[in-house]
Amino acid sequence: MNHSTISADIISFTSLGQKDKREIEQKIQYLLEHLAQQYSSIHFYGRIVQGDTIECAMTSPTYALRVALLLKTYIKSIELSEQTEKDNRVKYFKEYGIRAAIAVAPLSVFDDMNGIIDGEAIYMSGRAIKHMSTSNKQKIVVKDTLFFRSKNEEEQEKFESIFSLLDAIISKCSQKQSEVLFYKLSGLNEKEI
């Protein structure tokens, strides 16, 4: 049975000030808890590992893209302190937020109650992110930030095109536009926003 996983890393996280890092971690943790409640029917589980890496898993791939876009738009909508804004690399955080990979494949172990995720899906999404990482590099070059991985090559090719288009559109969104997108993806209408 195919599950869906999302592996993501926060772009330019090491360039952020300590206060901003802690605030972002807290806000992401809050979002992951909210998503666990909202998507409890598909056993959504999300966690932050190594400070700037996010891992999520769910029993159904149906909502994987929505969850990835919720993460991306939510993180892009976070305001940073003025001190952090002065760092040149922070512009990458503001433009892209996170780099995320969705994988649809089996998981050999998925125990959301104990936080255990193991299997092909988490390896595929994790490798996609690790392969595209910009950490420990002198110059940051970010081309794409949304990826799809599947054992089915035909399926992967179809989704990669869609993901590239979504990536280009969302990367152009401002902080406020990202916030509005987040609320729309959360199911709110214009009046509620």
Predicted regions and their residues:
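Regulatory and interdomain segments flanking nucleotide-handling catalytic cores
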Residues: 1-192
